[in-house]
Amino acid sequence: LSEKASGSDAGSLRTTAIRDGSDFILNGHKKWNTNGAVASTYTVYALTDPDKGMRGISAFIVEKGTPGFTVGKREDTMGIRTVPVNELDFVDCRVPESQLVGGKEGGGFRNAMMTLDRARPGVAAQALGLAQGALEWALRYTSERRQFGQTVMSHQAIQFMLADMATQIEAARHLVYTSARLIDAGATNISKLAAMAKVFATDTAMRVTTDAVQLFGGYGFCRDYPIEKYMRDAKITQIYEGTNQVQR
């Protein structure tokens, strides 16, 4: 979906799919494709009618190895470094009409928005796990590390930090689970709650992991412990599947 000039503004994408008989010819460049180098099948959004704006966007299934489709450079990301994130290029890439999602043109943008509604609680769950892991490490470390003749956790200022971290995590957990239950129940109008869960859980993850680094002191800034990785991994959850500013 994303391109160099169209991230949050997904409706402004420039990749085109021009009909040629019973085929479509794709031309364009895609950015920020998670698992871009390892996937075998891709959903590609392109303009089939540029004059209609977002209503002219259609979705296509494109398989790896299709002539004209190549995987580009891998991004050097700050976090989630085990996940390959790649650029994708389409140059006169021919796909048959049978690979038009939904069987008709113009439904791509709606398809993308419905997909994101269900993906955002997943990102929220990812963030929740990062926050929970950071809290557990922080509790363990502050209960063992001694300063000024007592454990770090014995200081009331540290207890307040840990209490806030735990409170925010539990609030995020309820939003994540509630949105997941609605999806499992077949609810269709989930856009608002999905956005709320995504915003709150990912902001919580960023705060909690940052505070955990602080509680570890110098060790939090090193790779002796996984805390610095949690903080780096948490950052992307505020960005992908719709930035938190757009969700608000």
Residue spans of the language-model regions?
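Flexible, small-/acidic-enriched active-site or ligand-binding loops
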Residues: 12-14, 65-94
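Conserved hydrophobic/aromatic beta-strand scaffold that supports enzyme active sites
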Residues: 12-16, 23, 41-45, 59-61, ...
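Glycine-rich phosphate/pyrophosphate-binding beta-alpha loops
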Residues: 6-8, 31-37, 80, 117-122, ...
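Short loop segments at secondary-structure junctions
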Residues: 20-22, 47-51, 64-67, 91-98
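Cytochrome P450 core scaffold surrounding the K-helix E-X-X-R motif
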Residues: 8, 99-105
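A short core secondary-structure module
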Residues: 27-71
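Alpha-helical interface subdomain recognition
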Residues: 19-24, 87-93, 103-107, 114-248
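A gly/ser-rich beta-alpha-beta helix-loop segment of oxidoreductase catalytic cores
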Residues: 1-19
